[in-house]
């Protein structure tokens, strides 16, 4: 029974570790201050649909 427990814990650890690492690279743009949702003081542009009605996209 203890062996089964260890196998389950090991499997969960191995499966969750790569998915956590992979998500870090995809979130870089979302963490960047200069992404589409960031309100730029210089030009007032925003290309995200949530703020598009208040700001021009400029593309």
Swiss-Prot record:
Q: Which GO terms describe its cellular component?
A: extracellular region; host cell postsynaptic membrane
Report residue numbers covered by any propeptide: 17-42
Where on the tree of life does the source sit, at the highest rank? Eukaryota
Q: Where is the signal peptide?
A: 1-16
Give the family from UniProt: Belongs to the conotoxin A superfamily.
Q: List the disulfide bonds.
A: 46-51, 47-57
Location in the cell:
Secreted
Identify residues that carry Cysteine amide: 57
Comment, domains: The cysteine framework is I (CC-C-C). Alpha3/5 pattern.
What is the name listed in the Swiss-Prot or TrEMBL entry for this protein? Alpha-conotoxin CIA
Q: In which tissues is it expressed?
A: Expressed by the venom duct.
